[in-house]
Design a protein with these regions (language model features):
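Bacterial Sec-dependent N-terminal signal peptides
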Residues: 1-30
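Membrane-proximal, proline-rich intrinsically disordered regions
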Residues: 21-71
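Conserved, well-structured interaction surfaces
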Residues: 46-50, 54-60, 84-161, 177-192, ...
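Short coil/turn linking the two alpha-helices of tandem helical-hairpin repeats
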Residues: 158-159, 165, 232-241
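Acidic, serine/threonine/proline-rich low-complexity intrinsically disordered regions
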Residues: 170, 184, 237-246
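Amphipathic alpha-helical protein-interaction segments enriched in hydrophobic
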Residues: 215-225, 229
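Conserved small/polar residues in nucleotide/adenosyl-binding loops
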Residues: 247-253
Length: 257
């Protein structure tokens, strides 16, 4: 009798397992995310926004060149000197760098522009998220987070490259012909644009976020980034619009600094 009960229980268990396997295998795949449906849900909309943060340039990494992971940016100037003569930063110091040499890290130029493109796309589409999924208050927060990030990406490039290309609000087709012939915006145009964008973004950002959202943009972050940008721009040594002459700073012969 006991053997019969055990056998019956074993068949029930096996049947349940087979049924569960069949139901799992019969599941329809989740709807793939596309440009048409990604903004239909709050979850996927937030995921898109969160991904824009990943385009933050890795300026904490010390390397200034692509084939070196231990040389800081200062090695590309006269602010410091290193004994590694086989590193590509010497091509800058020896004036042998040319456009065909891929020296600088990609994430100091290519990556910010990718982030700017993603921020533009998000800002143009976040309003498509239905109100039952995302209320107007949070929608405004999301929009201004992307606006802050876009301005921040510009602000991070300016200390490295000086004035850059301002894309504006529309996504740009980077494969179009003639784009490489476009002149850069002026320093003042870049600073004024970024400062205004940070100011406007600050108006629509919260003072703080719950702890689970630690690290997301806030009003204070936007205003702090704006203040730092304007502080640096006020220095003649930084913005370069008015070249400073040091010809009057001479030293006696054989003097050491």
């Amino acid at each position: 009798m006991k053997n019969t009960i055990k056998t019956f229980a074993l068949f029930l268990t096996a049947g349940a397992m087979l049924a569960s396997c069949d139901s799992y295998l019969d599941r329809q795949p989740d709807e793939p995310l596309t440009s048409d449906n990604i903004f239909k849900k709050q979850k996927t909309t937030l995921q898109y926004l969160t991904n824009i943060y990943s385009y933050q340039p890795d300026y904490e990494a010390p390397a200034c060149v692509s084939n070196s992971n231990d040389i800081p940016w200062e090695a590309c100037s006269d602010e410091t000197s290193f004994a590694y003569l086989d590193r590509s930063y010497t091509q800058i110091n020896y004036n042998s760098w040319n456009p065909s040499l891929h020296i600088y890290r990609d994430d100091t130029y290519n990556t910010p522009y990718k982030g700017i493109r993603e921020a533009n796309y998000f800002m143009q589409n976040v309003h498509k998220c239905p109100p039952e999924e995302l209320n107007d208050v949070d929608k405004g927060y999301y929009y201004n987070e992307a606006r802050f990030l876009r301005a921040h990406f510009y602000a991070m490039m300016l200390p490295v490259y000086g004035p850059v290309f301002l894309i504006g609000d529309d996504p740009v087709d980077f494969t179009q012909s003639g784009l490489d012939q476009r002149e850069r915006n002026t320093w003042d145009e870049c600073v004024n644009y970024v400062a205004n964008e940070l100011w406007e973004a600050a108006k629509g950002l919260p003072d703080s976020w719950p702890d689970i959202y630690y690290g997301r943009a806030t009003k204070g972050a936007a205003l702090a980034a704006r203040a730092r940008l304007l502080l640096y721009s006020a220095r003649k040594l930084f913005n370069g619009n008015e070249p400073v002459s040091y010809t009057h700073l001479t030293l006696p012969t054989n003097s050491r600094v």
